[in-house]
């Protein structure tokens, strides 16, 4: 194929620049990859991060003495093996340390030192009276004999509690014995001291005060666990201060001291039984006590030693009342007044709800003494309220403790669910709390306790807490010179035979944590993103490295896209590195649980992937990676820096606040007691003024605890400051400068997605809030606290719309030659949030020449509703329209010809001036030829399309041909799943009032738990099933189910037509937690009367949040609307709240009952009213048998018409009723006699309401109704499904259809003209306007010559894809052939004579060569100059389109004159004269003139290239 005319692509490109870029064309958009997961970080919204920590309780106390001879309690070998065991312990301890704080381990950098309380000297304080390792010693000095430490013979025994409490002087060094804490101290000395310590932050905390400073006399809590157990806050505070002093004497700096631990709870109780109770030698508890007593506690008193027979033994802890908390904080501040480096932290509540409760009871003076807020995360609720408090007070918030197991079942260190769950817990909690850190409860757990079950004594918990694991009793030296667990040796008959020595073990959480801690470090900033549950995003301290940690918890690989649009710069050489953390290999798992060491986990931890695994697209502003199923990807980007302007809320900029829930703007219009209310988003200047707010940032000091806080003063258009006042919003006349130090005028921005915000008032710690979640204009905008859930409230969430325009929408205007161009008076401006209208008063068209075809620019100034003036341009195309795009419409099967015609006539017609942008045509000029359409439609079935031709009347003499298509499809499927009428489930949890929770499965909320199959007995069905009964046969197209955080092992969908034979629907799946699974027929739809989703679980429960079933609707089909939205159901009498059960979809269980202790004589009436009148076709009542004939004698149906009048439909009776009185029984009536009363209306009625009056039997027996169904004709307007056509309707080059184009032909080759400089403009249009067209390939790059283009067409329903290719064969200029001019010899001073010069361009394409003469006046031809001032051979260069060649001429020297001659007047300037009158002796070729002429010619050509504008489909 040949292009008949030379390509003018260069001029097309020039015209494109004039027009402002690419132009949208109908049918050229393409769908995004539905399988891609996208995260959008916002680097502007960043919070400083101090690092990763762990409490040292209890593992440090249990392991710090490893490697010391004194720690060995049993030696099974000799002295030599014992010495080896001591050395083994040292190595084990160091390996253990490195696994936690080493840079190849978890790389933690923070430690919480547990200041012990301890119990009395005669109380057995250790295992099994405490949890293993939990007996953290108090540092007060033991004096069991009363030797004088505390004076007056006071001992440290239980009986002297009160005396000791009185005698104890917490400031006296002599009353302390810090050797007792040596085991835990080892960890501090090893990690937190020296010049470059691993542990950079140390916090001292206590679980309990010393036993004698408690009310109960025990460090394990009160006898009443909910009562205050702190007896002396002042001495306890001083005790804490002294321990801080001790820690700092070791060389550590204690940053914070926290005197409480979950002290608000009632967790901490001392057992009521004493060890002396257990005397039965056959009792396992007695055996356990005796195993340890003689060896360790022979000097203790069983009668004062509490013992618990529970699996979990006691630990230190105390409930502290709020009043005692305040006294402790006050006393601690006094005790620390000389320590400038240590601040008080509080309250270490178990969750944010408890923290907020305690905080709200503190007076301001107490709050001022607290330097840091600490909170645990054992619940995610109320975390945003904790965050708000810390932000408003300008203090750091520490997430100071959490752990858990995300692995179901018993001990399984390899279970990767634990890694995935831990990653999500970290990312979501750090982001939501904006905490300075993430600190584990204890990142280590006692291996024995995690691993062992109930079949041994002592039993273990057999679960999966902790991250690193080690036995907490490695005190037995084996004959092999290794250490062993004392419990394991005891269980093994006192030998080590067959036992594994003490080893550092890990579980899968170890890798899940490392996937984050090895990439996000102290000093980095955690940044917001749109999916905090699955992504943690951060930027390095220097801003040069961007980190994204992403988990794929699904069962298939993900295409993971990082949206970089909110970053400021993407360097040309930007690159990314990908590290993957995956499940341990089957081979390593098969080695057994004792082989689950950190070294084994390292094999699949942070494995660096090949270069190029992260694909950065600078133009698209994306980074893309493939993340395998069930893995964690750690991605680091280099060369991506800063933040984009639209990612930030810039100081001095003006914004609209548009509500997420309401879609309306905040206006400074009073409503109630607030100065603010909702208003429709302004479309005029007057209203816009009331909705614009200027944000002025309050800069935070560099030494601030919250340097990254996004705090602002907000002013309205009049300059008034938005403030909180009396619990609501007001406008103040204070200055912005004054407002910056006014908490009431300080607004703090929070975001959960990096794009929408909540506005927190610092004074009230409440958010800008739409009253009662209203959405109507005038609704008050007040203040309210953040919600207790994990997501911000929609009525507190705002889009901040910067009202400064950024660019304009392209304006293209077409006019015929010599006709005045009509330019718009309104244009569209783009903003960071979207688009808005602006008015134009006058266009400058001085550069538009309507007398000549071409593309011209017009300019104007546009003014938007916010008062901004913005310079805009329009491109005016002068010339006639030449070609049209395909036109299509899609209609339902069965549509009449008139309706089909109307659909096509309503479709827009787009036309072009050759390759110009598209212009919508005038519908009045369109004529379609519908001959034979009636017949074609009658024969058409769903999936067919009908071709139609037409014309566009350009003028009286000219028409443009139109090609149209009418697609015939079935109706778009609708979701019919409804728990009120057709959906039922099995195995729903009934405990904790969750029996009806499954009914939320069709409420549209995919986030809230609905169907859950848990039960306390752990008796789980293998196949929890959800079934939908459609009531009649229908066309089923798809079914979806969204799972919660517990997905089944597998799931399948089935359907039936007869209720007995079930057939597979789609494929079996193995869903992941949180996944939405869609089941589809292999092709099209299936006929079904019922469908079901069958889930298989492996001895575990599952949960789901939403189910949908899509069927092809039938116009006017009857549908049960009894429980539908818009239907209101009421009864005149009911037992309790039973009426609602009459419309719950259950026709077999008891529902509405009118039983009463005193029989009612009122006839029961059920009424249904409808928000909109309904066409009723049937009303059906299912009565219920409860052992007697509890139903009416008759039932009457009435309806209310649209005018409000009631009409009777009929009365039904004739079923069996009682013969005697109401209490006489059923008179032989059985359940089989239960009536179902069915009113089928032969002629449907239009009703605003219906009512059923039940006439009581003569016995006045109550009635029981199982279900009432009300059927109405479905008023849903059916819409056709998208078509499945993926063919091209037209393929054009430079505005002309490609020669030989046929929709069925997919490959085209174009031989370009020899002298083409660029490819012609390629445009592709689908036959179906709703299909997506995407053009790719090097051939469509601007200025490209040759190459290949691929055109991918995706059908509107995305079921079909078709690819076309266009290959451009191009000749390239290889060389020039030059034949020199006729004149080859010149005298000095002569000019070049080009007569006879011939230049030939030599083009090549493969093995083909073509020669084309070049005219000497070609503006691209340049002929060089030569120096004619000296004699000799001269080379002259000829260049053409970047290729050069030379030819030679000779300059001869002037002949020597024989002697002086008389000079004749007037000849001094002739050539060859020796006089200096010839000032220009260098030959000029005119090349500079040619260059100027060439530039002028190009500009002129560009101006005339209206038909060559490049537009890519």
UniProtKB/Swiss-Prot annotation:
Chief location category: membrane
EC number: 3.2.1.213
Domain F5/8 type C span(s) in chain numbering: 965-1112, 1116-1273
Domain Ricin B-type lectin residue range list: 666-801
UniProt keyword list: Carbohydrate metabolism, Cell membrane, Glycosidase, Hydrolase, Membrane, Repeat, Signal, Transmembrane, Transmembrane helix
Composition skew (Polar residues), residue ranges: 1465-1480
pH dependence text: Optimum pH is 4.5 with beta-1,6-Gal3 as substrate.
Gene Ontology cellular component annotations, sorted alphabetically: plasma membrane
Superkingdom assignment: Bacteria
Temperature dependence: Optimum temperature is 40 degrees Celsius with beta-1,6-Gal3 as substrate.
Recorded topology in the membrane: Single-pass membrane protein
Region (Disordered): 1456-1480
This protein's record includes keyword Transmembrane helix: yes
Pfam families to which the protein is assigned, alphabetical: Big_3 (PF07523), Big_4 (PF07532), Cadherin-like (PF12733), F5_F8_type_C (PF00754), RicinB_lectin_2 (PF14200)
InterPro entries tied to this protein: 6GAL/EXGAL, Big_4, Cadherin-like_b_sandwich, FA58C, Galactose-bd-like_sf, Glycoside_hydrolase_SF, Ig-like_bact, Ricin_B-like_lectins
Function text: Involved in the type II arabinogalactan (AG) side chains degradation. Specifically releases the non-reducing terminal beta-1,6-galactobiose (beta-1,6-Gal2) from both dearabinosylated larch AG and polymeric beta-1,6-galactan chains by an exo-mode of action. Shows lower activity with larch AG, and very weak activity with dearabinosylated gum arabic, gum arabic and potato galactan. Can probably release beta-1,6-Gal2 from the internal side chains of type II AG.
UniProt record similarity statement: Belongs to the glycosyl hydrolase 30 family.
Name under which the protein is recorded: Exo-beta-1,6-galactobiohydrolase
Source organism: Bifidobacterium longum subsp. longum (strain ATCC 15707 / DSM 20219 / JCM 1217 / NCTC 11818 / E194b)
């Amino acid at each position: 194929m040949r292009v008949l005319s030379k390509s003018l692509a260069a001029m097309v490109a020039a015209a494109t620049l004039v027009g402002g870029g690419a132009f949208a064309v109908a049918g050229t958009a393409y769908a995004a990859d539905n399988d891609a997961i996208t995260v959008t970080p916002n680097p502007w919204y960043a919070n400083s991060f101090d690092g990763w920590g762990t409490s040292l309780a209890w593992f440090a106390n249990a392991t710090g003495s490893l490697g010391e001879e004194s720690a060995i309690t049993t030696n099974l070998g000799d002295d030599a093996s014992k010495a080896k065991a001591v050395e083994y312990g040292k190595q084990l301890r160091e390996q253990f340390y490195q696994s936690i704080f080493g840079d190849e381990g978890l790389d933690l950098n923070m430690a919480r030192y547990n200041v012990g309380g301890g119990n009395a000297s005669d109380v057995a304080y250790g295992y099994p009276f405490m949890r293993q390792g939990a007996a953290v010693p108090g540092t007060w000095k033991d004096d069991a004999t009363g030797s004088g430490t505390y004076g007056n013979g006071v001992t440290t025994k239980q009986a002297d509690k009160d005396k000791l409490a009185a005698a104890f002087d917490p400031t006296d060094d002599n009353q302390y014995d810090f050797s007792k804490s040596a085991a835990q101290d080892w960890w501090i000395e090893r990690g937190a001291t020296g010049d470059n310590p691993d542990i950079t932050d140390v916090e001292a905390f206590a679980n309990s005060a010393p036993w004698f400073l408690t009310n109960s006399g025990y460090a394990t809590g009160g006898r009443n666990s909910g009562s205050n157990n702190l007896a002396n806050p002042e001495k306890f505070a001083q005790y804490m201060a002294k321990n801080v002093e001790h820690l700092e004497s070791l060389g550590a700096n204690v940053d914070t001291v926290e005197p409480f631990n979950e002290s608000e709870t009632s967790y901490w109780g001392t057992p009521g039984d004493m060890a002396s109770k257990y005397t039965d030698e056959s009792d396992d508890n007695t055996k356990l006590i005796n195993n340890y007593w003689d060896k360790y506690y022979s000097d203790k008193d069983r009668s004062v030693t509490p013992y618990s027979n529970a699996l979990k033994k006691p630990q230190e802890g105390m409930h502290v009342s709020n009043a005692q908390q305040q006294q402790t904080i006050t006393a601690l501040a006094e005790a620390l007044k000389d320590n400038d480096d240590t601040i008080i932290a509080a309250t270490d509540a178990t969750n944010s709800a408890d923290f907020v409760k305690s905080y709200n009871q503190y007076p301001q003076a107490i709050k001022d003494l607290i330097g840091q807020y600490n909170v645990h995360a054992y619940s995610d609720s109320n975390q945003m309220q904790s965050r708000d408090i810390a932000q408003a007070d300008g203090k750091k918030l520490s997430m100071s403790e959490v752990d858990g197991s995300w692995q179901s079942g018993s001990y399984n260190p390899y279970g990767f669910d634990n890694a995935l769950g831990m990653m999500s817990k970290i990312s979501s909690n750090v982001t939501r709390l904006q905490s300075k850190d993430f600190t584990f409860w204890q990142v280590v757990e006692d291996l024995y306790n995690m691993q062992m079950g109930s079949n041994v004594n002592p039993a273990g918990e057999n679960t999966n807490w902790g991250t690193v694991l080690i036995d907490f009793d490695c005190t037995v030296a084996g004959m092999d010179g290794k250490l062993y667990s004392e419990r394991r040796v005891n269980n093994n008959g006192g030998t080590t035979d067959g036992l594994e020595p003490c080893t550092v073990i890990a579980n899968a959480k170890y890798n899940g944590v490392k996937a984050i801690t090895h990439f996000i470090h102290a000093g980095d900033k955690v940044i917001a993103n749109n999916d905090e549950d699955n992504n943690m995003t951060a930027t390095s301290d220097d801003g040069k490295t961007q980190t994204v940690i992403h988990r794929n918890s699904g069962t298939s690989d993900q295409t993971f896209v990082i949206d970089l649009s909110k970053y400021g710069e993407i360097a040309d050489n930007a690159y990314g590195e990908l590290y993957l953390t995956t499940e341990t290999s089957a081979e390593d798992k098969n080695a057994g649980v004792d082989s689950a060491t950190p070294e084994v986990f390292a094999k699949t931890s942070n494995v660096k992937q090949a270069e190029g695994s992260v694909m950065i697209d600078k133009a698209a502003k994306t980074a893309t990676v493939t993340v395998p199923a069930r893995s964690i990807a750690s991605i680091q980007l280099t060369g991506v820096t800063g933040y984009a302007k639209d990612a930030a809320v810039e100081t001095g900029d003006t914004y609209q606040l548009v509500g997420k829930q309401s879609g309306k703007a905040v206006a400074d219009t009073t409503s109630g007691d607030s100065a603010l209310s909702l208003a429709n988003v302004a479309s005029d200047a007057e209203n816009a003024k009331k909705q614009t707010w200027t944000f002025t940032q309050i800069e935070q000091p560099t030494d601030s605890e919250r340097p990254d806080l996004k705090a602002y003063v907000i002013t309205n258009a009049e300059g008034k400051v938005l403030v909180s006042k009396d619990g609501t919003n007001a406008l103040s006349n204070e200055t912005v400068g004054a407002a910056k130090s006014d908490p009431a005028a300080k607004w703090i921005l929070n975001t959960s997605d990096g794009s929408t915000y909540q506005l927190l008032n610092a004074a009230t710690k409440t958010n800008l809030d739409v009253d009662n979640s209203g959405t109507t204009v005038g609704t008050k905008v007040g203040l309210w606290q953040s919600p207790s859930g994990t997501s911000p409230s929609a009525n507190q969430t705002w889009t901040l719309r910067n009202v400064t325009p950024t660019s304009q929408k392209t304006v293209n205007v077409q006019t015929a030659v010599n006709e005045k161009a009509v330019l718009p008076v309104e244009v569209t401006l783009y903003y960071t949030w979207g688009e808005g209208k602006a008015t134009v008063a006058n266009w400058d068209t001085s550069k538009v020449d309507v007398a000549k075809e071409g593309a011209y620019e017009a300019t104007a100034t546009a003014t938007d509703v916010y008062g901004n003036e913005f310079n805009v341009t329009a491109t005016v195309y002068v010339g006639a329209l030449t070609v049209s795009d395909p036109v299509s419409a899609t209609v339902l099967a069965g549509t009449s010809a008139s309706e089909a015609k109307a659909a096509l006539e309503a479709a827009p017609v787009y036309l072009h001036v050759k390759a110009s942008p598209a212009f919508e045509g005038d519908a009045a000029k369109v004529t379609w030829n519908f001959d034979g359409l009636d017949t074609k439609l009658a024969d058409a079935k769903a999936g067919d399309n009908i071709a139609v031709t037409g014309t566009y009347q350009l003028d009286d003499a000219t028409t443009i041909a139109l090609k149209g298509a009418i697609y015939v499809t079935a109706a778009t499927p609708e979701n019919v799943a409804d728990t009120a009428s057709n959906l039922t489930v099995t195995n729903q949890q009934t405990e904790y009032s969750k029996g009806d929770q499954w009914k939320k499965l069709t409420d549209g909320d995919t986030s809230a738990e609905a169907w859950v199959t848990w039960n306390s007995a752990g008796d789980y069905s293998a196949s929890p099933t959800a079934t939908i009964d459609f009531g009649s046969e229908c066309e089923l197209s798809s079914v979806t189910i969204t799972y919660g955080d517990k997905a089944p092992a597998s799931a399948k969908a089935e359907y039936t037509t007869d209720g007995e034979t079930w057939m597979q629907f789609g494929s079996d799946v193995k869903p992941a937690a949180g996944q939405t699974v869609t089941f589809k027929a292999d092709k099209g739809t299936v006929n079904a009367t019922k469908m079901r989703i069958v889930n298989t679980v492996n001895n575990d429960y599952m949960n789901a949040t939403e189910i949908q079933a899509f069927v092809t609707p039938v116009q006017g089909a009857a549908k049960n609307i009894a429980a539908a939205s818009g239907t209101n159901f009421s009864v005149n009498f009911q037992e309790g709240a039973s009426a609602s059960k009459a419309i719950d979809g259950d026709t077999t269980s008891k529902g509405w009952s009118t039983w009463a202790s005193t029989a009612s004589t009122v006839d029961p009436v059920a009424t249904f009213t409808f928000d909109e009148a309904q066409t009723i076709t049937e009303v059906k009542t299912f009565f219920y048998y409860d052992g007697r004939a509890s139903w009416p004698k008759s039932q009457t149906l009435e309806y209310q018409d649209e005018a409000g009048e009631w009409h009777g439909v009929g009365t039904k009776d004739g079923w069996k009723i009682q013969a005697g009185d109401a209490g006489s029984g059923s008179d032989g009536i059985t359940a089989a006699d239960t009536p179902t009363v069915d009113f089928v209306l032969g002629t449907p009625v239009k009703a605003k309401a219906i009512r059923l009056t039940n006439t009581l039997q003569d016995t006045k027996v109550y009635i029981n109704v199982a279900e009432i169904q009300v059927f109405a004709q479905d008023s849903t307007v059916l819409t056709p499904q998208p078509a499945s056509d993926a063919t091209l309707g037209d393929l054009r080059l430079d505005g002309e259809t490609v020669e030989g184009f046929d929709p069925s032909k997919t490959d085209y080759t174009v031989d370009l003209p020899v002298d083409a400089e660029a490819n012609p403009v390629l445009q592709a249009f689908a036959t179906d306007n709703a299909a997506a067209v995407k053009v790719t390939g090097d051939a469509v790059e601007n200025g490209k010559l040759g190459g290949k283009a691929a055109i991918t067409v995706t059908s509107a329903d995305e079921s079909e894809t078709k690819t076309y290719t266009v290959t451009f064969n191009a000749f390239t200029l290889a060389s020039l052939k030059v034949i020199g001019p006729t004149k080859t010899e010149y005298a000095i001073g002569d000019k070049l004579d080009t007569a006879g010069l011939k230049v030939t361009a030599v083009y090549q394409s493969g093995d083909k060569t073509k020669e084309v003469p070049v005219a000497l006046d070609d503006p691209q031809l340049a002929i060089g100059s030569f120096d004619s001032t000296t004699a000799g051979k001269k080379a002259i260069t000829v260049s053409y389109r970047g290729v050069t060649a030379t030819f030679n001429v000779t300059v001869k020297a002037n002949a020597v004159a024989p002697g002086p001659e008389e000079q004749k007047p007037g000849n001094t300037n002739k050539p060859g004269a020796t006089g200096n009158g010839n000032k220009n002796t260098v030959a000029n070729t005119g090349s500079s003139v040619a260059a100027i002429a060439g530039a002028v010619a190009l500009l002129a050509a560009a101006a005339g290239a209206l038909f060559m504008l490049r537009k890519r489909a």
